[in-house]
Amino acid sequence: MNIKRNQNNSIDNNLSIDSNPSPIKKVKNHLDFSKSYNEDDEPSNDLDLSFNTSNISNLSNINGEEDNDDDDRENEPKDIDNPNPSITTTTATSTNSTLVKKTNNFLDFNFAFEPNKEEDDEEEDLNISLTTEDILLSQIELLKAEWDYITYNKSPPLVLQSVYHQSNKDSERSIQILKKKGTIRLFQIATSLNDYCIIITTDYIKNIELLKIENTTIPNKIKPETLTNNMKNSSPIKSAPIDTILLKRSEILDLFIKKLIPNFNEVSITRSKLFQLLSIVNDDHHQQENIITHLVQCGLLLQKDDCTFTFSVPGAGGFFLNLMKGRKEILSNIQRLKYKEILKKDLLKKKLKYSNVQMQLLIKDLLGLNKIKIIPTTQGELIRCVQFDEL
């Protein structure tokens, strides 16, 4: 009977402990993180029984001490190492919720792999602002940086089409895109029929603006044999009637910039088309001769025949002459070698006698014209002459 009473008392004690858990048990329940990870799962009876049977004696002792020392606990100073249970409960609860949130974020694949919206917006803005025209123009800008501004300061910076073709295999399509937009202009090199150079339109206009200030003509640019008999014998300003007001050079250049450049982007132009774009009446022959004279003297036009003119680059005659000399000198030097080939590093060390164009630029030019080719070797890049015909 005593054994049964003891068993009943122990069961009653267990029920009382479970129904009125102490603060310490509350803290332990809050610190039990397994409950937060498995909120939807049903509680395990085995775990609860093992906890109760293993800790009944300890919890009963703690409850007894709490009942006996209630009066003394009010007068005792607060221990820093043993904080207030309510505060501990709050801290544990917040820590528990933080861990649950981190765990949920870790398990939420949408949250983990969601891209940064601000970075996406910046990338979209960058892709929208960077067009095909900008990319192609940047390639020409890089090649333009190789221009010798000191030696050829009278000419706008230009890029040889052969050099651009060597760096961009789809150069023909790229040039047509930029040319159609009016971003660049194409000019035929006077010393060759199949050579062209590229000039950015803004650089071309800046160069023409400088011609307004200069009162003298560009030296070594206009030769008497390039002019027709009518232009040689005519003196538009003197022979014009008194009532005819001839345009000044600055006025003609303004018409050229504002009316011709935006509306015409070909290599050559006919006489009638030129005056149509400049809004010059066909019957006013004195004014027409006056305009042609000034444009030829400024180096903007070269007369191809009686009815056709080709556009030229002001001040670039010296560069084109040195370009042709440099091409021939390099090819002739390679042709004189036994195997008609030379290492690129050895060629770069040589100095040209008849040209002041940079050796690196001439090599790119000849590669673009398919006059030479580069073969990689163990000693470095080898330059071999492919053909040596009349340039």
Swiss-Prot record:
Annotated organism of origin: Dictyostelium discoideum
One GO MF term: protein serine kinase activity
Family statement drawn from the similarity comment of this UniProt entry: Belongs to the STK19 family.
Encoding gene (name): WHR1
The protein's name in its UniProt record: Winged helix repair factor 1
Record's compositionally biased regions (Acidic residues): 64-74
Keyword annotations: DNA damage, DNA repair, DNA-binding, Nucleus
Superkingdom, taxonomy of origin: Eukaryota
Biased composition, class Low complexity, residue ranges: 1-24, 49-63, 82-95
Cellular compartment(s): Nucleus
